[in-house]
Regions:
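Active-site rim/adjacent substrate-binding subdomains
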Residues: 1-100, 112, 116-121
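Short alpha-helical catalytic segment bearing the HExxH-like zincin motif
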Residues: 100-108
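Short hydrophobic/aromatic patches at helix-to-coil boundaries
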Residues: 122-126
Length: 126
């Protein structure tokens, strides 16, 4: 059964997860804000080849550090989206929710650093 919390509590869990990140990830949060949304938009899902009923826990929107160049100046800033309802759906308890939020934040920050899905799976952030 999904574990639901208030928007304020979920935001607190995201902040706590960000505060406990390994040093190499924590420094990136100054560059990449985290935005909490209830669910991904249809446009976001379609851009990933997903249907409306598929879950998406988080999304990194931007250009990974490994692909940047001087030509990138003036582009929109990177952002990480965390989708509260989908994270809650895969969490059966408060502890599950805490762990899933942290894993999702780490996963999306990994994309910021240029890591692939396979790289993240190997690190346990898949």
């Amino acid at each position: 059964m999904p574990h639901h919390v208030s928007k304020a509590r979920f935001a607190e869990l995201v902040e706590r997860a960000a505060a406990t990140l390994p040093a190499q990830f924590a420094s990136a949060l100054a560059e990449v804000p985290i935005e909490i949304r209830d669910r991904p938009s249809t446009r976001m899902l379609r851009s990933l080849g997903l249907e409306d009923d598929e879950l998406l826990l988080g999304l990194y929107h931007g250009r990974p550090r490994t692909e940047r160049s001087v030509e990138d100046s003036g582009r929109l800033p990177d952002v990480i989206y965390i989708f509260q309802e989908d994270v809650e759906l895969v969490s059966e308890s408060e502890q599950d929710l805490i762990e899933q939020v942290r894993t999702t934040v780490l996963h999306e920050l990994g994309h910021h650093f240029g890591m692939s899905e396979e790289d993240l799976d190997e690190l346990g952030y898949g």
